């Protein structure tokens, strides 16, 4: 099945196939964003953790569209206070949503929402006709080998900006374990502290057998 991936900057993506899946909606306050939160009409919203640069527009988009917000239990309980439709999950769990399979994985990071503890961060493996792994904010970790061998994502969306997540070299180490044939970098160059060169990532990844696509913001990647 044809799938379209659109990078909205930072870690925010739309994945369009059987359904329109929006991940980590950070448009408001995102210096890379070329669209506004009100321009997006997802069927479901996935949030990897509660930090503002990943969850900023989740509530407003959900209220406007009725799309449920999927996140870990603790963050989901916070979202419920806004009166939106929520779905909770935890690492290892899988949610089936109207023909789309969404599995939560671990991630090595932290999570809070407006200063409140928001559970553990996660990544997601999304089966929407193609298997796509959004790692969330994370460093590389040994269990990526299991994600690679068990879930077998065809496309991995990986942070490369360093400081708060793995950097370019770390993302290449992740690819050695994931063995995805295609990768797309994220979480870089939004702010000075996460400056990174995606072309360096592309070149290093090629040496471990992964083709890296470096899209421009709002430039669709069709697979």
Curated annotation (Swiss-Prot):
Gene Ontology molecular-function annotations: hydrolase activity
Keyword Manganese: no
InterPro entries in alphabetical order: Metallo-B-lactamas, RibonucZ/Hydroxyglut_hydro, UPF0173, UPF0173_UPF0282_UlaG_hydrolase
Keywords: Hydrolase
Signal peptide limits: none
SMART domains from the UniProt entry: Lactamase_B
Family: Belongs to the UPF0173 family.
Name of the protein in its database record: UPF0173 metal-dependent hydrolase TV0864
